[in-house]
Curated annotation (Swiss-Prot):
E.C. numbers: 3.6.1.-
A biological process term (GO) from this entry: nucleotide metabolic process
Protein known as: 7-methyl-GTP pyrophosphatase
Subcellular location: Cytoplasm
A Pfam family matched in the record: Maf
Main location: cytoplasm
GO cellular component entries: cytoplasm
Species: Xanthomonas campestris pv. campestris (strain ATCC 33913 / DSM 3586 / NCPPB 528 / LMG 568 / P 25)
Record-linked PANTHER family: 7-METHYL-GTP PYROPHOSPHATASE, BIFUNCTIONAL DTTP/UTP PYROPHOSPHATASE/METHYLTRANSFERASE PROTEIN-RELATED
Homology family: Belongs to the Maf family. YceF subfamily.
Amino acid sequence: MMPRLILASTSAYRRELLGRLHLDFDTARPEVDEHALPGETPQALATRLAGEKARAVAVRFPEAWVIGSDQVADLDGQALGKPGTLEQARAQLTRMSGRMVRFQTAVSLIGPDGFAAQALDLTDVQVRPLQPQEIERYLAAEPALECAGSFKCEGLGITLFDAIRSNDPTALVGLPLIAVARLLRQAGFSLP
């Protein structure tokens, strides 16, 4: 019998990505405060939140394997959170215009037997120089208020970039499947 697997996320994008591995899984909302701690780096924030999300769900489902993931946009060492409002999204996109932004995407796997492992994927995005009217058109068409960096790379947001550099093309969407598959194999899951 396959062990129960739970994705600690309600993100449709993460659910779609994990579905690519052809594993049966459920989803559960992790109740976690996503604010950065004083002095916390973007990498430490992403790693901590991925672990906290997995642990928050594992407490509710102690018999299950739980995957938690978090992504933080890193501009010059400063974490850019989910914008939440159009004003914040506009400000983030303006700050990122013509700049390289590093996306720190962490994943954590926790098992019922005490297994715990994490991985981190780094994706560098070169944002092209953006005119104010381009930002306005983008936000009118696709307000990505719940996305790190204020864009959806799997949608119209891809038009905002000059280049993406990553070892895992799924990481920028929010769940680095190469790392997830590696962690699941380490835990004994059968994947090709």
